[in-house]
Amino acid sequence: MGIKVQRPRCFFDIAINNQPAGRVVFELFSDVCPKTCENFRCLCTGEKGTGKSTQKPLHYKSCLFHRVVKDFMVQGGDFSEGNGRGGESIYGGFFEDESFAVKHNKEFLLSMANRGKDTNGSQFFITTKPTPHLDGHHVVFGQVISGQEVVREIENQKTDAASKPFAEVRILSCGELIPKSKVKKEEKKRHKSSSSSSSSSSDSDSSSDSQSSSDSSDSESATEEKSKKRKKKHRKNSRKHKKEKKKRKKSKKSASSESEAENLEAQPQSTVRPEEIPPIPENRFLMRKSPPKADEKERKNRERERERECNPPNSQPASYQRRLLVTRSGRKIKGRGPRRYRTPSRSRSRDRFRRSETPPHWRQEMQRAQRMRVSSGERWIKGDKSELNEIKENQRSPVRVKERKITDHRNVSESPNRKNEKEKKVKDHKSNSKERDIRRNSEKDDKYKNKVKKRAKSKSRSKSKEKSKSKERDSKHNRNEEKRMRSRSKGRDHENVKEKEKQSDSKGKDQERSRSKEKSKQLESKSNEHDHSKSKEKDRRAQSRSRECDITKGKHSYNSRTRERSRSRDRSRRVRSRTHDRDRSRSKEYHRYREQEYRRRGRSRSRERRTPPGRSRSKDRRRRRRDSRSSEREESQSRNKDKYRNQESKSSHRKENSESEKRMYSKSRDHNSSNNSREKKADRDQSPFSKIKQSSQDNELKSSMLKNKEDEKIRSSVEKENQKSKGQENDHVHEKNKKFDHESSPGTDEDKSG
């Protein structure tokens, strides 16, 4: 077991923006890495002077913390430049990595900063979290013992992009903390050194003497004896000092013991006689049987003996003596129980006012009865009280008679004058009570009469009020009935108007439904026709292609004709598609117009509810006229469309017939062409291109003339049909207007009468 060496400790007094933040104390692991710890300790104390390379004091005082990374570490120790590029060790420049034994496995560890392997200078860092990735790269040589909150405060400072804190975190002062035990040892060493110096001085004196008397041996022996004597004296003095110390200690102990004894004497002592101490009771809780009866008999005998000693044989017992009482007059009262009488005093005149004749128990009963009577009188409200009071007095009178008899028996010495006075008092009391009862009854009768009168008045008033209320109710009821009748008549009129509107709406809806059905049928027929025409066109194109292939062998002229025919057909189809598109656009516009009319009708209906019935009727007439006109227009348009379709179908039949004739003609031409093939070959050899051009030009002129004629015919037929439809519409409108005029005349008369 080796002696545990005390680890060195250093401190930093830190200021943030020149305001003291606190002290941080470090413990250095000098047993693990002594060289690194010595470097840090000397830089804290500043005892090594200036550096060799930096030429600045090797001291951490007024040094900055130049790098702060939250949740990682706090770095400082660059005393030369203050930005992490400077610093120097006490050994000059850098020194090697000493030991990686201690790991970065916890927070608040003190470790050396470096630029790589074996580049330790003066810069250090304090970890704020475990950093195991630094193990094997940085030497851990200490830890923070106190001041962790100061390190946290430095860590929480705001920094720039280079992790430099905006606030100035500076080490105000630093140094080494020396424990007290070391200080005491150093003082002892100093004392020893001083004593050794004194002894050396004495030795020097003796040596000088010996040098002076070196010639004689006697002087040497004398010096030796002197030194021995001094040692003996020193020993004696030390022994005396020890003895004196022991005596002082003993004297102190004796003084303390004496003071304790005085305190004990001053305290009061309790004196108890041994006779007074009761005997310790026996444990009888385990005894199953009851104790013997002999003891009980002995106790009874002892009690009897004590009573005999207290009461001699001639004297009466104590219980009887206690019962004997003496009155004021000196009479002895004998008997048991409480006293029921007493002797009257000699002076009756005084006693009359002081005390009553009745004994105390009778007085208590009387007071109880009086209380009950008073309370019953207060509680009774209705009816007469005279009978009840008389019954109570009759009940109480025998009690009073008994009282008199008892007093007559017991007080024989009472005089007749006193009896007369008592009778007078009783009579006066009875008369007074009767008078009170009579007064109370009379007052109650008066009150009852007044109440009856008030009730009668209130009843008469209530009857008059009820009559007036009933009249008001009747009048209100009549008014309400009149209002109801009016409202019912108005409601009926309104319902009639609504029914008419509903009928008109239903008619309009039916017409619209029929129109929509017709339109859907027309669209279906159109789509079918379109599909049929497409299929026909495809067949025709296929036939025309096959014909063209046959004709191209020797008939360029016939090919040009077929092309012109196909072009004319395409143009006619385009014209049809245009007309179809126009019809569709017109139908869309018509649908929009119908939707707008529906919206206007909805608004007009909401207005009609507010407006009077006369205006609503006039609006209904206008709407009917508009609906009739629109329906006539639709019918005329539908007729025109049907006619146009019939014409188109006829024209298509004609074209098909003409095409069939042309096919027959082309077949006959094919037979003739075989005979004249030699002549045509010769013509082709002469000028084939010129002949083809001439034939194509002629065909184009003919086809254009035919198309123009067909277009003029179609236009003229459409115009005639439009004129006819317009004339029919005008006739129909005139007829409807006449009908509406006939129908509207009674409605206007009704409005005038209303």
From Swiss-Prot:
Signal peptide: none annotated. Ubiquitous. Gene3D superfamilies: Cyclophilin-like. GO terms for cellular component: cytoplasm; cytosol; nuclear matrix; nuclear speck; nucleoplasm; nucleus. It comes from the Eukaryota. Keywords: Isomerase, Isopeptide bond, Nucleus, Phosphoprotein, Rotamase, Ubl conjugation. It is an enzyme of class 5 (isomerase). One of its GO terms (biological process) is protein folding. Residues 292-310, 348-368, 379-449, 463-553, 578-599, 628-686, 707-754 have a biased composition (Basic and acidic residues). It catalyses: [protein]-peptidylproline (omega=180) = [protein]-peptidylproline (omega=0). GO terms for molecular function: cyclosporin A binding; peptidyl-prolyl cis-trans isomerase activity; RNA binding. It is found in: Nucleus matrix; Nucleus speckle. PPIase that catalyzes the cis-trans isomerization of proline imidic peptide bonds in oligopeptides and may therefore assist protein folding. May be implicated in the folding, transport, and assembly of proteins. May play an important role in the regulation of pre-mRNA splicing. This is Peptidyl-prolyl cis-trans isomerase G. It comes from Homo sapiens (Human).
